[in-house]
């Protein structure tokens, strides 16, 4: 038995991923819970049930009750969730006036929040505002926080002045804490529902940041491919690179940067190819089976 076990939860656009990871980084168990809701606006209502389902399945797969010492929460960003659960996914398109865009630049979040607020004004009146992982952390701990990957990211988030410029109040936003910090302790009632002790809940943050940390792309010259519904080829560098087609963001390591080439639809295209193959063979395929098929057939659409 390992000394410490960590439940790592990541919220995607279509599923919740859960992994039990040891203190040495060994993945002891992994599973994916797909969301059922066809209404993307209420998708956040499924997240807690997905956590319960994941824990139940992890325990069923184990010969003994799973021991969990802490929980880490990450998720896609910038998905926005209001206190009443209205959800605006990170891949949804927005359209706002250039004058507004200029006023709140370079924030990656405020343009989406402004657009969402105008669509659902009642959900924003004196109510808390979260990203996806922060909303689940709030549900688990009752703590309202904002996860900041590194101090240089503040401009990409918000300031009090910019929040007020779109007629919202700074009090609606959680206080900044850094990735890896303890966001709180599992609420007593929630702990009982999940059949867990009141363990620490750790701020994982945006899935992009967690993927960079998890693959140890934290030294100059290291590279990783982060793929989901979209994809990014990421390079760690000590020099920021600004060029069309590349996105440069601070690394979680002070003084370093992450340069990415983004492929916005590669994951969706892969799924479309998989579906076509399933129709052809008349049965559902796991991703492992489809990848094996592609690797054996250079002429296949998914090669």
Predicted regions mapped to residue ranges:
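Short glycine/serine- and small hydrophobic-enriched flexible loop segments
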Residues: 56, 114-118, 271-278
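Glycine-rich beta-strand-to-loop/alpha-helix junction loops that act as flexible
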Residues: 74-77, 179-180, 227-229
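Gly/Ser/Thr-rich active-site cleft segment
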Residues: 11-13, 103-206
């Amino acid at each position: 038995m390992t000394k410490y076990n960590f439940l790592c939860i990541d919220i995607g656009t279509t599923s919740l991923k859960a992994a039990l990871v040891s203190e040495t980084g060994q993945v002891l168990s992994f599973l994916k819970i797909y969301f059922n809701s066809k209404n993307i606006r209420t998708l956040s209502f499924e997240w807690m049930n997905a956590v319960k389902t994941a824990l139940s399945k992890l325990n069923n797969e184990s010969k003994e009750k799973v021991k969990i010492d802490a929980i880490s929460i990450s998720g896609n960003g910038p998905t926005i969730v209001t206190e009443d659960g209205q959800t605006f996914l990170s891949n949804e398109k927005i359209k706002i006036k250039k004058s507004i865009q200029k006023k709140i630049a370079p924030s990656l979040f405020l343009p989406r929040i402004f657009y969402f607020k105008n669509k659902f004004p009642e959900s924003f009146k004196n109510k808390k505002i979260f990203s996806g992982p922060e909303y689940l952390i709030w549900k688990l701990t009752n703590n309202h926080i904002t996860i900041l990957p590194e101090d240089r990211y503040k401009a990409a988030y918000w300031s009090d002045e910019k929040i007020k410029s779109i007629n919202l109040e700074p009090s609606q936003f959680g206080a900044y804490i850094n990735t890896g910090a303890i966001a709180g302790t599992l609420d007593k009632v929630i702990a009982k529902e999940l059949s867990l002790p009141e363990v620490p809940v750790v701020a994982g943050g945006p899935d992009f940041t967690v993927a960079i940390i998890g693959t140890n792309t934290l030294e100059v010259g290291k590279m990783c491919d982060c793929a989901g519904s979209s994809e990014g080829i990421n390079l760690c560098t000590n020099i920021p690179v600004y060029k069309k087609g590349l996105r440069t963001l601070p690394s979680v390591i002070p003084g370093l940067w992450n340069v990415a080439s983004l492929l916005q639809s590669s994951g969706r295209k892969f799924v479309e190819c998989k579906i076509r193959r399933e129709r052809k063979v008349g049965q559902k395929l796991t991703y492992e089976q489809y990848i094996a098929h592609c690797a054996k057939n250079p002429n296949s659409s998914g090669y």
